[in-house]
Amino acid sequence: MFRYESLEDCPLDEDEDAFQGLGEEDEEIDQFNDDTFGSGAVDDDWQEAHERLAELEEKLPVAADEQTGNGERDEMDLLGDHEENLAERLSKMVIENELEDPAVMRAVQTRPVLQPQPGSLNSSIWDGSEVLRRIRGPLLAQEMPTVSVLEYALPQRPPQGPEDDRDLSERALPRRSTSPIIGSPPVRAVPIGTPPKQMAVPSFNQQILCPKPVHVRPPMPPRYPAPYGERMSPNQLCSVPNSSLLGHPFPPSVPPVLSPLQRAQLLGGAQLQPGRMSPSQFARVPGFVGSPLAAMNPKLLQGRVGQMLPPAPGFRAFFSAPPPATPPPQQHPPGPGPHLQNLRPQAPMFRPDTTHLHPQHRRLLHQRQLQSRNQHRNLNGTGDRGGHRVSHQDHLRKDPYANLMLQREKDWVSKIQMMQLQSTDPYLDDFYYQNYFEKLEKSSAAEEMQGDGPKKERTKLITPQVARLEHAYKPVQFEGSLGKLTVSSVNNPRKMIDAVVTSRSEDDETKEKQVRDKRRKTLVIIEKTYSLLLDVEDYERRYLLSLEEERPALTDERKHKIWSMYDNLRGKLPGQERPSDDHFVQIMCIRKGKRMVARILPFLSTEQAADILMATARNLPFLIKKDAQDEVLPCLLSPFSLLLYHLPSVTVTSLLQQLMNLPQSATAPAPSNSHLTAVLQNKFGLSLLLILLSRGEDLHSSDPTVESTQNNQWTEVMFMATQELLRIPQAALAKPISIPTNLVSLFSRYVDRQKLNLLETKLQLVQGMR
């Protein structure tokens, strides 16, 4: 796991004057704590206790070499009678269940004995496992107190979970426990800033504490120090002073000031006195299993004894993060450095107490800590993949309001601002600005007249001189603007509606009203005619159910309703000889009207139905244009086919002339007939034309009594229809709905064989129909 085989090979960054420098810094008066908590926050004289502690540190090497009871007696003399009993009882506090753990005892027995090196301070005491066997007996033999002095003096705290996800800076600052005027609390009182009394945590960190408050120097030189060692290897952390692996929660330049009792207990652990714990046993205490203190070199532990302890409950008034609870160590086979396998150090997180700060100051401090943490993550390769790592400077330089507007929007705003500066009448557009600069110019002119100093030239705003076009104001008109898209421009950035106003004359409005009224009348006629049609269709049922004497009246009623339907379709006015086709065309332009005509034709007489067919043939191109979307005209083909078998040859010839838009007399037609072209390009028109040609050919070939004049008319009409079919391109020719069977013999009488084959190809005649 590490580059070195043992902790002894790890290089130590230890200064010889560490204790001396620590003592010199402790001698300085902490003005910050005095201003915050008052001068009466400490019950005893801490300077005198610190001087005794400094003398104890000087006598530490001598006391470590003797291994007798003299060192303990000298230490007790320095600390005094009151602290002697307390320190001795605190140092004997060992959890019995943890010492009886077979995993812990096996790790103690299998640990190899390290060879002491010259120059080390009693390395056998720290590394030898035999010492643990000698002191284990006295430790277990002595009676463990049920409630220790520390548990009695300090507040009880419940077990706390990990507080990484909780913002500790939001906790309220507790009340001050002392007052500079009233005085100090008794020794057994709660330290300053300690939370209310709660359940105690059974950890070694709480057992080694002193009930006296701990003075901590504020981190003044580095205002917001960044946490060390988030992504560094343990070997690198060993070489970094005050790193998080060493358990030092303070900033690098601020060492903690421990109480005399804590310092005496830690330094006194180096002597092999009965009831005291060696660093080897100290590292195996359950509170330190898995902590950075257990994975250190004994020399490093001995040299950094005043800095390696994690913050105890006394420190939690300022560092409010409790020590993390770690599971008991697992069993590993013996090998080189078993303590490195059993104990995996984890760097504690530094969380300062900021309850004494202003809420806005706390929020700023929290943001800077997050930025510093992200910086270390990016530097150690924990950022985004693919090289998309942003430096801390770029992160701080990032504008939160960047990229909120497109370049087009920025140019838009700039143009609007520049347009506001373009003015032909500045006093009207910007009165206050002009008056302000006039006052400035007057004051500057007065100063120039009085003083002889250099003239001051004031910067003036230079506006672009662009001619402004005056636009006549037109209020927005909402009439006819429904469904229009909104249009935005520089002049009208929030234009609500782009209204299109069209002025119409009275004649146009009159015509539009007439068309609208005409369509409404047509719809009313269609509904009335449909009611008559339903009554006529229900006549047979009523006729069978009626009595014999009621049937003549029903027959007359049926005839009357059929005439009414025909009159509604044709729109014949009283006294008018021939009805107009306009009314019928209006009905045929509506889909419901076309379906209604197809249902009415079987009930009409032959003359009435022939008149409907004639009107349809005359206006077929217009009806085809109106039927392009509905395509309902093919429903009329079946009733028209049945009607053609009841019409004479003269009527069929006249109907064909109406369909082809030919005059009644035998005259030469125009070379191009748009009417016939529109009929041939529609499937209903082409199918109706082929049916008329087939029915007319049958009538003229089977009736020898037909006059020669009628035969000549028929021959001329057939010749014109054949020429038009040959002229129109095949792609423009529509596909007919049905093709008569006698059509090939019909065309063979009027064209040659080559043209007949071309007609067959165009009309897609199937083989065998010849």
UniProtKB/Swiss-Prot annotation:
Region (Disordered): 1-42, 320-341, 369-394
Pro residues: bias regions: 321-337
Keyword check for Magnesium: no
GO cellular component, one term: PML body
GO BP: deadenylation-dependent decapping of nuclear-transcribed mRNA; P-body assembly
Domain of life of the native organism: Eukaryota
Database matches in Pfam families: PAT1
Keywords, ordered alphabetically: Cytoplasm, Methylation, Nucleus, Phosphoprotein, RNA-binding
GO molecular function ontology, one term from the record: poly(G) binding
Region called Involved in nuclear speckle localization, residue ranges: 398-770
Comp. bias intervals (Basic and acidic residues): 385-394
Residue numbers spanned by region Involved in nuclear foci localization: 1-397
Compartments, as annotated in UniProt: Cytoplasm, P-body; Nucleus; Nucleus, PML body; Nucleus speckle
Region annotation (Region H) ranges: 389-448
InterPro entries, per the entry: Pat1-like, PAT1_dom
Region (Region A): 1-84
Residues that bear Omega-N-methylarginine: 385
Residues annotated with Phosphoserine modification: 177, 179, 184, 278
Residues spanned by motif Nuclear export signal: 86-95
Family: Belongs to the PAT1 family.
Quaternary context: Interacts (via region A) with DDX6/RCK. Interacts (via region H and region C) with LSM1 and LSM4. Interacts (via region N) with DCP1A, DCP2, EDC3, EDC4 and XRN1. Interacts with the CCR4-NOT complex. Interacts with the Lsm-containing SMN-Sm protein complex. Interacts with EIF4ENIF1/4E-T.
Stated role: RNA-binding protein involved in deadenylation-dependent decapping of mRNAs, leading to the degradation of mRNAs. Acts as a scaffold protein that connects deadenylation and decapping machinery. Required for cytoplasmic mRNA processing body (P-body) assembly.
Protein name as it appears in the record: Protein PAT1 homolog 1
Organism: Rattus norvegicus
Gene that encodes the chain: Patl1
